[in-house]
Regions:
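Bacterial Sec-dependent N-terminal signal peptides
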Residues: 1-23
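Accessory carbohydrate-recognition regions in carbohydrate-active enzymes
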Residues: 22-380, 384-428, 434-502, 510-520, ...
């Protein structure tokens, strides 16, 4: 036993040494465990509580936007707000093919867990968990390994989009077991052992949350596991009952299966696994296509290459390893979602119902799990820059959902409608893609769905209750805002009337921009207000003004008679008419009309004073999305040096290279996408327009490798921790004084060059001609 344990430790040591010889690989700048511990940043301590105190990320092995996230498991539940892995936990219970919506407070679904154990058979997750050390854990995007101390088993995993291969080196080969669970918290599911084909097969039914909580989603998470070795013993179990020699079991709490392998010498055994949302045949085809062999190292190298290509889309030059690790860690986390949902043959379950199965056309993928209230802000704009073809496929998937379900979804997750969060931001994602030149999706059908959401409510109460259509649209259209009397009872989170008004106004603006670019005729869709569609939507784009209290300059609850709440002090307190924040956070949410917002606040001077106070009085909360554009809003007032200062401060204090290094939920990659953009020196304050607002580039040189073969390079001479202020700029060799630039500047390739210094240059980017355009003119 001692000799075998020494052998395992040597394996760990050799792999660690290998890392040292591959420093040039970008994968080794990524520690996938960042965000798995309680947030330790400044604003997390001020505002974070309950589920917001974690980044809710995973140390997952995956392909970018792949189907499965292969992760160690320390939590044995698919429950809402419980990630499969937390850094603080001391025992690993297995390795899961997770479909967790990474970085959020949602649920896992359709998952399966397998665990190698040795010695006495322990099959329940809470019993079989093994102590482990983070010092004996290796976590990269393409490979994970850990020493399971209780069993002296060295466990390794790598994989592809829908499949994985495991290498387990057992210390006690005469008592080498494999445990498999379909992870149903609902007590449903099925598992069977096929000793002829050397397979374990099963499924875990998917259930909805939010609208239709607990209802079947109409499809299952199927899985297949293959092994090579002969077995000496097998059986099934249900909670605390063991059924030796039984080949199958269905339904019940804690069901699973086990094998005892017939191996009598030291050395690794290999296990392969794959999944599908269609059927068992789909899982088999996924495995046979993606990993048709038993070569662990080959699969690992394939996944290494995929990640190397992904991460090298943006190359940075710096002597600061810490910042380089933060950047590539953020790019990794911005590569999880939306997930591939179809099998290798293109089949996937119908949106909303599960049946019949659909077929993706022309070799494209169908995507699912859009945490759209979060990701329209920066993650989807980042995809539009780095992988526009994939972006178009993601947008076509939204169109497919509209065609299959009858309504454009609000927050599509689990291949189902939900009204979990507010707004109608599939409109923003679709509009941003189209405005930025992405054409490989059906914009006409998309427009049909967007207009339906903007002007109609479901014909039946059942549809509305099921999550279709905008919440409280009738009130919004009647009053020009959602009054406090409308409690929005059929939303998962009721009330939030002011935030809904603000976000609908923005979505209406984006839809207007799409119609204008399409030059859509007014008979494209019946307009109940009898004016041009574009004009109607642009009027509605100003509805945000209806919830800005002119006496305070802050967003505030308003009654149907037009009166505002009288308590001015509540601008700084969390309240039910605001989504996950206070009025002082949401007041800044008019990304499409910052100059109009400035007017609502009483002019530029008061606007600047309020903006200053957000930071000087510690009201800014980076841990939640409504604040993400705020630091960039100084540019609109001609004070871009303040944007440069605050953005750099956020990057330094709200992003750490540590397990607790995120300031709140990563929310499907939005938090990380903010960092990627900000490190590059710009941010999409208003998706649906072609403009990027300039911040403070943090690396001396960055190059964005574009799909069209061109390169956009950002040079920041003298950039470091002290030299955070822009002194001057050039675009393609010409002096540049604007504090923004366009998407076209990126896609045509070129060089944006900055001279950086330790003191603000209050003249650069400050003149009236330097400010971002007024979108409302």
């Amino acid at each position: 036993m001692k000799s075998t344990l020494s052998y395992l430790l040597i394996i760990c040591s050799l792999f660690t040494a290998c890392i040292g010889h591959q420093e040039e690989s970008l994968l080794f700048y990524v520690d996938t465990r960042t965000g798995t511990a309680p947030s330790a940043t400044h604003t997390a301590e001020l505002f974070g509580k309950n589920t917001e105190e974690y980044g809710q990320t995973l140390p997952a092995v995956l392909e970018p936007n792949g189907m499965n996230f292969w992760t160690p498991q320390t939590q044995d539940t698919e429950a809402k707000c419980k990630a499969p892995y937390y850094y603080k936990d001391t025992k690993i219970q297995g390795f899961r093919n997770s479909h967790w919506i990474v970085g959020g407070c949602t649920q896992d679904y359709g998952s399966m867990t397998l665990m190698p154990v040795s010695g006495t058979l322990k099959y329940l997750p809470q019993d079989r968990g093994s102590l482990f050390s983070h010092q004996e854990e290796t976590a990269t995007p393409a490979y994970y390994s850990v020493l399971l101390k209780d069993y002296s088993i060295f466990a390794e995993m790598t994989g592809r989009s829908r499949s994985a291969i495991f290498r387990f080196t057992y210390n006690q080969p005469e008592d080498a077991y494999l445990i498999v669970n379909p992870n149903s918290d609902e007590g449903k599911g099925y598992i069977e052992i096929d000793t002829i084909k050397k397979q374990i097969r099963g499924y875990n039914p998917v259930h909805r949350i939010y609208q239709g909580w607990g209802e079947p989603a109409g499809y299952n998470g199927y899985f297949i596991i293959e092994y090579q070795n002969e077995i000496e013993e097998y059986g099934t179990f249900r909670h605390d009952s063991l059924f030796a020699g039984q080949r199958q079991i269905a339904d019940g709490t804690g069901i699973g299966a086990y094998l005892r392998f017939k191996i009598h010498s030291e050395g690794p055994i290999l296990i392969k696994a794959a999944s599908s949302f269609t059927d068992m045949e789909g899982a088999q085809k996924n495995l046979d296509t993606e990993i048709p062999h038993w070569d662990f190292d080959r699969t690992r190298q394939e996944l290494n290459s995929i990640w190397e290509q992904r991460l090298s889309q943006v190359t940075v030059q710096t002597n600061n390893r810490n910042d380089k690790e933060k950047f590539y860690g953020a790019l990794y986390r911005a590569s999880f979602l939306p997930r591939t949902f179809n099998d290798v043959d293109g089949r996937y379950p119908s949106f909303s119902t599960g049946h019949p199965f659909r077929q993706s056309a022309n070799g494209r993928n169908y995507y699912e799990d859009y945490s759209m209230w979060d990701t329209y802000r920066a993650l989807h704009p980042l995809v539009n820059i780095l992988t526009p073809k994939k972006a178009g496929d993601m947008m076509q998937s939204l169109v497919d959902k509209y065609e299959q379900g009858g309504w454009l979804p609000i927050f599509p997750c689990w291949n189902s409608y939900t009204a979990a969060m507010i707004g109608d931001h599939c409109i923003s994602a679709l509009g941003d893609a189209y405005i930025k030149g992405i054409r490989n999706f059906d914009i006409n059908k998309a427009c049909e769905g967007m207009l339906r959401n903007a002007f109609r409510t479901p014909a039946t109460y059942e549809e509305y209750k099921n999550g279709m259509g905008r919440r409280a649209l009738n009130s919004y259209l009647k009053y020009g805002y959602i009054p406090l009397e409308d409690s929005v009872p059929e939303a998962f989170h009721t009330c939030e009337q002011v935030s809904r008004t603000l976000e609908y106004a923005y979505d209406d603006f984006v839809l207007a921009q799409v119609l204008q670019k399409l030059e859509t005729s007014d008979d494209y869709f019946p307009d109940p207000q009898k004016t041009g569609l574009y004009d109607t939507l642009m009027i509605r784009a100003r509805y945000y003004r209806n919830v800005i209290n002119p006496s305070t300059g802050y967003a505030q609850g308003r009654y149907a008679d037009g009166s505002f709440l009288t308590d001015a002090g509540n601008a700084f307190s969390f309240t039910r008419f605001i989504t996950e924040g206070a009025p002082c956070h949401y007041t800044w949410y008019a990304p499409h009309d910052i100059y109009g917002l400035m007017e609502c606040m009483g002019g530029k001077k008061k606007y600047i004073a309020k903006l200053d106070s957000m930071f000087s009085e510690h009201r800014y909360w980076h841990g939640n999305e409504p604040c993400h554009q705020i630091a960039y809003l100084f540019n609109y007032a001609g004070q871009p040096w303040k944007t440069q200062r605050e953005v750099r401060h956020i990057m330094e204090t709200e992003y750490l290279n540590a397990p607790g290094g995120l300031s709140g939920n990563d929310d499907a990659g939005q938090m990380s996408a903010w960092y990627v953009f900000s490190a590059m020196g710009f941010y999409p304050v208003c998706p649906g327009t072609p403009y990027y607002i300039i911040g403070s580039p943090s690396f001396p040189r960055m190059s964005i490798r574009l799909e069209n073969g061109k390169t956009f390079t950002i040079l920041a001479h003298n950039a470091n921790k002290k030299n955070i202020y822009i002194q001057s700029a050039k675009l393609n060799g010409k002096e540049y004084d604007k504090n923004y630039f366009t998407h076209q500047d990126i896609v045509q390739g070129g060089t944006l060059e900055f001279q950086m210094g330790p003191n603000p240059n209050t003249n650069w980017g400050a003149s009236a001609l330097s400010l971002p355009p007024d979108n409302m003119k």
